[in-house]
Amino acid sequence: MSAEVPTFKLVLVGDGGTGKTTFVKRHLTGEFEKKYIATIGVEVHPLAFHTNFGEIKFDVWDTAGQEKFGGLRDGYYINAQCGIIMFDVTSRITYKNVPNWHRDLVRVCENIPIVLCGNKVDVKERKVKAKTITFHRKKNLQYYDISAKSNYNFEKPFLWLARKLAGNPQLEFVASPALAPPEVQVDEQLMQQYQQEMEQATALPLPDEDDADL
């Protein structure tokens, strides 16, 4: 008998149009093996990753666009063990709504590890700059710039979550999953610049603002 693969429910949330479905579909096996749960209108993609401690799997719950019609039902969040909140760096309103998604998620799942992802960093007209991305620091989340269409930083959120869930900072991915070929290319120099800007921004004190709505 082969050992059971540790499997974790991951909820993927954020405004409609931020690239959540594009992101999850990059992982080809997960896309091939996805299942549709009609009762709550969700697609579940089983994303497997190979680590130096064996295989780990995330059952990624994708909302299939329901968030466009208001909030998601609690049934979507129940028993989630980790989460990714996504916004679009070309759309300020999607970042402004991040606290609402975070509130809904932690109301049902209190102390789960969560990664905040700013998607579409391949687009030149970036609106949400590093210095304005502070929510993750207030709430102790991890943050990554990503570009779903180019696969840039695709594995980063999953690796961070895997380490948290396994309680092992030494965990590494030893083989890359098969990903859909990039539809766009990122500018490597620009990505390095963004990373430096993020590091510099993280070193700054958090702005004094009214946290009542965050």
Swiss-Prot record:
UniProt: GTP binding residues: 15-22, 65, 119-122, 147-149
Stretch list, region Switch-II: 65-81
Gene Ontology CC: cytoplasm; fungal biofilm matrix; nucleus
Chief location category: nucleus
Alphabetically ordered keywords of this record: GTP-binding, Nucleotide-binding, Nucleus, Protein transport, Transport
Disulfide pairings: none
Family to which the UniProt record says this protein belongs: Belongs to the small GTPase superfamily. Ran family.
Assembly, per entry: Found in a nuclear export complex with RanGTP, exportin and pre-miRNA.
Protein name: GTP-binding nuclear protein GSP1/Ran
Organism ancestry: Eukaryota, Fungi, Dikarya, Ascomycota, Saccharomycotina
